[in-house]
Amino acid sequence: MKYKDLRDFIQRLEALGELRRVTQPVSPVLEMTELCDRVLRAGGPALLFNAPTGYDFPVLGNLFGTPRRVALGMGVDAGDDAALDSLRDLGRLLSALKEPDPPKSLKDAGKLLSLAKAVWDMAPKSVSSPPCQEIVWEGADVDLNRLPIQTCWPGDAGPLVTWGLTVTRGPNKSRQNLGIYRQQLIGRNKLIMRWLAHRGGALDFREFALQNPGKPYPVAVVLGADPATTLGAVTPVPDSLSEYQFAGLLRGSRTELAKCLTPGVDTLQVPARAEIVLEGFIYPQEGAPAPAPAGAPPRPAGNASAKYEHALEGPYGDHTGYYNEQEWFPVFTVERITMRRDAIYHSTYTGKPPDEPAVLGVALNEVFVPLLQKQFTEITDFYLPPEGCSYRMAIVQMKKSYAGHAKRVMFGVWSFLRQFMYTKFIVVVDEDVNIRDWKEVIWAITTRVDPVRDTVMVDSTPIDYLDFASPVAGLGSKMGLDATNKWPGETNREWGRPIEMDAAVKARVDRLWQEIGL
């Protein structure tokens, strides 16, 4: 089933028993986090808080708290297991778009043409008088404190926008970038835009600042987009395809877009049926910036974007289960807020796994598998355990063909997709190990690994700056473990033979099991 907007999706989830309305007053300060966290850990429904304490806007939480709801958001109506299979089909589609196979026949050529036509037909379309602009706040009416922005953890620096779909465009680019970056509230119309240096929004901003020094950089933030657009922003979409176009493929209909209203920001387009849209700029720094507080990291310097307004972000409780360090990021000044009538504020929290991003990671893991298999045909399965903060550890199952093969796969995974840039640990196992069962993975590590021979250490590599275990912020080491059976050339010893029961005996005991009534 396809959903034209967030409200359509909410209605469907409620009909399936996948959403619960909370009519009791619940505060966005800490209480929503605690309630959503308990419900998510129990595999419970999405929550629509109809009476957030002190606010007039309902709050939607735990929307993608199960793999089934992630699949539903992508248009797949199935149970958890079938949903994950369908997500692999989506990965195959992305793989075909990223690197199409050369056609071997007229039939194959026809399939490629059909796929190209489907992508072309899903080009976004512009609409006038969109629902997302039914209500407009301008001037003194622009006050972010009127929105029920969550404060998630006791040690957080303040309220935090968590599901903001940020729309940017680089200079001379027709394609808009969509990314989800958290944003700290620091004033009635000011947010800190926490985007890491390699993310699309940060790259667009740096390129703009380099080519247009001293000019304000336009940004729009969407709160409450339809599920296909939201999930498209967190999916590894090929660079040649816009997230809006990919959302159209998921939805089965073209994404409707509306131009922003603010002069200068009207070069950007946002989902026409979004709940709330923030329009504004990252402005150049006026005058000399105030010195950094004692003990704070130094202000950014040395590039064109450093000449724009920045502020210290954090600390905040993060997906690692810890509070992160403070860091400087650009300040986004909101000049206009547009919204639908009776707008819904979409929010989440991040914390020690499992949290909502970890569940999204489990679902998107299935999308990654076909992408990896397209590049590395020896990979038979791939798993990002949610306990590893969604991306910091990867377990790879492979069909090994020669000595050193596992190490080749390690470096291939680290370098293939941007999503694996921050993966610290990779464990490679053979086909006989179920990589989704920790008992089997640990058995393979403890019986097939020699720490000196089978450990690969790589120093001075890009690391998530939130990873305080690294000696330098943003730069650290990676480790690979070859837990495969060793081939000649990798060992001089006779390798152990796994114990297996005789097949005929197993069949006999299967029958006996039923007779005994065990």
Swiss-Prot record:
Its cofactor is prenylated FMN; Mn(2+). Mn(2+) binds at residues 177, 243. Prenylated FMN binds at residues 180-182, 194-196, 199-200. One of its GO terms (cellular component) is plasma membrane. It is an enzyme of class 4 (lyase). It catalyses: a 4-hydroxy-3-(all-trans-polyprenyl)benzoate + H(+) = a 2-(all-trans-polyprenyl)phenol + CO2. The keyword Membrane applies. Signal peptide: none annotated. It is found in: Cell membrane. Its main location: membrane. Pathway: Cofactor biosynthesis; ubiquinone biosynthesis. GO terms for molecular function: 3-octaprenyl-4-hydroxybenzoate carboxy-lyase activity; metal ion binding. HAMAP family: UbiD (MF_01636). Belongs to the UbiD family. Catalyzes the decarboxylation of 3-octaprenyl-4-hydroxy benzoate to 2-octaprenylphenol, an intermediate step in ubiquinone biosynthesis. This is 3-octaprenyl-4-hydroxybenzoate carboxy-lyase. It comes from Burkholderia lata (strain ATCC 17760 / DSM 23089 / LMG 22485 / NCIMB 9086 / R18194 / 383). The lineage of its organism: Bacteria, Pseudomonadati, Pseudomonadota, Betaproteobacteria, Burkholderiales.
